[in-house]
């Protein structure tokens, strides 16, 4: 049973009310679309945008996919890979998370909820990573990129864990342009789901580093209206959101349901109009559809 969550539950219910069995669907590469995929197709049609979803059920490695192999702009969901790359360094450079970087006024970007308090002061890489993942602080992200030696090294880290799809080309806030057809700073839902699984539940990071990444994700402050809003109360979630032009609205999550194996869920959404507003409600509705369909 899904417990009510006030206005957010009403909003999700309103979105789901638009479902129609006759909605055109994007079939999986083999076989007929499932009922869950049909519901996702109806949600997408109602939204007027393009929706990408990938869910991995770790109990049996089964997947639910919708446009799982299509590219979407990652926006700030890419920050997960950046922080993971820093954590990877800490496996061999044991004190690196305590390394400090100076925050200068010139470093500040369009979103600096944490770093703006540290102008002309120092922050450790651990503090920058937490700010990046839990508050989506763009300056913190850029400082981590500076430490890592640029975006190409983040892409190289993704390749090292077997992700051949992820590509990070620009820093914040330029990476959020999300121009249709532009492959810069993009990935596919399934590729991101597999990488998130490796990083949070697999062996891409050593135990202590994996636990730290999960702790940061669980402490995220920006995801309350996205995937989390579509799940039953009592389920534990660690996630990273993202947003950009064309109403691009993203969330990637590792989920611990009550009394069952963890889930990995990636939801990407974008729209045709550059000035379109974000639609966190679409992500919440998609999360409800796929988890009810398990």
UniProtKB/Swiss-Prot annotation:
Phosphoprotein found in the keyword field: no
Residues holding substrate: 240-242
Example of a GO biological process term: beta-lactam antibiotic catabolic process
Enzyme class, UniProt record, top EC level: hydrolase
Signal peptide region: 1-27
Active site, renumbered: 76 (acyl-ester intermediate), 174 (proton acceptor)
NCBIfam families: bla_class_A, blaSED
Family: Belongs to the class-A beta-lactamase family.
The name this protein goes by in its record: Beta-lactamase
């Amino acid at each position: 049973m899904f417990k009510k969550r006030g206005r957010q539950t009403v909003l999700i219910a309103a979105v789901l009310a638009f479902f129609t069995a006759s909605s055109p669907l994007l079939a999986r590469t083999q076989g007929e679309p499932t009922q869950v995929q049909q519901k996702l197709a109806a949600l997408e049609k109602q939204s007027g945008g393009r929706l990408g979803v990938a869910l991995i059920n770790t109990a049996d490695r089964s997947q639910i996919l919708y446009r799982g192999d299509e590219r979407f702009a990652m926006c700030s969901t890419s920050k997960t890979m950046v922080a993971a790359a820093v954590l990877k360094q800490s496996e061999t450079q044991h004190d690196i998370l305590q390394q400090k970087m100076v925050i200068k006024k010139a470093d500040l970007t369009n979103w600096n909820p944490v770093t703006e308090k540290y102008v002309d002061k120092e922050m450790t890489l651990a503090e920058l990573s937490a700010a990046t993942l839990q508050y989506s602080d763009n300056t913190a992200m850029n400082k981590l990129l500076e430490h890592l030696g640029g975006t190409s090294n983040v892409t190289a880290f993704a390749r090292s864990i077997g992700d051949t799809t992820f590509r990070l080309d620009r820093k914040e806030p330029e990476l959020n342009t999300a121009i249709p057809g532009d492959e810069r700073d993009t990935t596919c839902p399934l590729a991101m789901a597999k990488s998130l699984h490796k990083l949070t539940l697999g062996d891409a990071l050593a135990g202590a580093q994996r636990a730290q990444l999960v702790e940061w994700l669980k402490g995220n402050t920006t995801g309350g209206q996205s995937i989390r809003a579509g799940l039953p109360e009592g389920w534990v979630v660690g996630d990273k959101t993202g947003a950009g032009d064309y109403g691009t609205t993203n969330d990637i999550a590792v989920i611990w349901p009550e009394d069952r194996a963890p889930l990995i869920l990636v939801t990407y959404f974008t729209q045709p109009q550059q000035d379109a507003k974000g639609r966190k409600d679409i992500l919440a509705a998609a999360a409800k559809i796929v988890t009810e369909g398990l």
